[in-house]
Each structure stands twice: as structure tokens, then as C-alpha cells.
Amino acid sequence: RRENYRLSLSVSPAATVHVDDGDGRDPAASCLRVLDISGGGVALAVPDAAVSMFQPNVRLPPCLLRLDDAEPLPVAIEVAYAARHEVRGNVAWWRAGCRFVDLPAAIEQQVMQFLFRTERHRNARQRRGG
């Protein structure tokens, strides 16, 4: 049972997690789209080539969470699960459920503000019929 409200994200607003894997790869290769987010963690879209990093109970290297155009937030993330999500253009994508570890209260507050702001914008759009 979930302790936190979880918000599914579409392409907009943009939320990404940058994983510093330390191997000197192109930074874009380690920039992962957030599929959903809560105060307790994120689900990430992970390309097939990177899924080996996303094994259950593995704590990822230092990560930066970017919510819309705000400054990136440093977060510690531990993988809860990884499951095949979809295939797009002959490339398999995985859904990796991850929990925040020792999230500072100030960063948790910023995540929650993003959730509420995004939900308010969605509700306003729906009321306008869009």
C-alpha cells in the first residue's frame, strides 16, 4: 500500500533524473524520463542498454532530479524493481520503480510542491475542457 500520492507524468511537465554513472558517457544517455513521481520515489523509463544498473535493492550513483525548469535537486535513489515497459522502434524500455533514500525535508517539500502545482494545472485544463 502506498504512503504517498503518486502523479503520473506525460511529456509535459518534463521531469528527468540524471544518473552519474561515472563512466564518462554522453550525459544525455544517463538522463532518464520520469514516468511518475511521489514524495517517496519515482518510476523511470530506462532503455534496454542501461537496465543492468537497475537491479532491485541497488542504490544508484549520485542523481539529480530535474522538475520542469527548476534547478536540479540532488537525490539518493534505490531501485525497488525493474520490469519491461514497452518497445518503441525496436528498442525495449523498462520501468524502474525507485525510492528516495534519506530525502532531506527541503527537497521533499519541493517535490510535493511540484506534484500539487502539476495537479492544479491539470485540473484547471480539464475544467476548461482541454
Which residue ranges define each predicted feature?
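Structured alpha-helical
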Residues: 1-130
